[in-house]
Amino acid sequence: KCLIPLYKSLGPDFIKELDGEFAIVLVDFKNDKLIISTDVFATKPLWYSIGKSVTVASYESAVKSLKHVKPEKLESNTYRVYDLETRELLEEKRVYDFDLRQFRTNFDHWKVAFEKSIKKRAGGLRENIFIGLSSGYDSGGIACQLNKLNIPYKAYTVVGSENKDVLEKRFKLFNENSSGEYI
């Protein structure tokens, strides 16, 4: 419902206004344009082959199965605009332009951004949340933030070479909205 009006309003740059995980194929027959795009991290992969025919799929195997000689994976954070008739690449742009200048002197902004990202991804879900809980920083930070926000989740740990002391301490931090299991 929102993509076509956004495209009509902004043209191919409508992609820059999107937020989230996506792989998009938009065919504009009226203006003979084909637009393909991944999200910033290519969470949703997009494989394609553009030659005599156009093939786009989420899996490389789907493109290969049609005997196209060279399936290509669209890079993360990229959108391309092709002329639908000639198959010529008209433009390639980044979905988001990262500012990598280092000017922060503390972690305050990071903490706010991390909390916001957890709220965004954990809010309004139709399914229950589960996380793979290891003794590493990533899953520990996610579990900590979910607990802080009282967001219900279930954690699973496959015990192997994990630091068991760290895992035991993390399991003690579960609140009434969270629980975990060792596998």
Give names to the regions the model predicted.
Residues 1-183:
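Cysteine-centered catalytic environments shared across enzyme families
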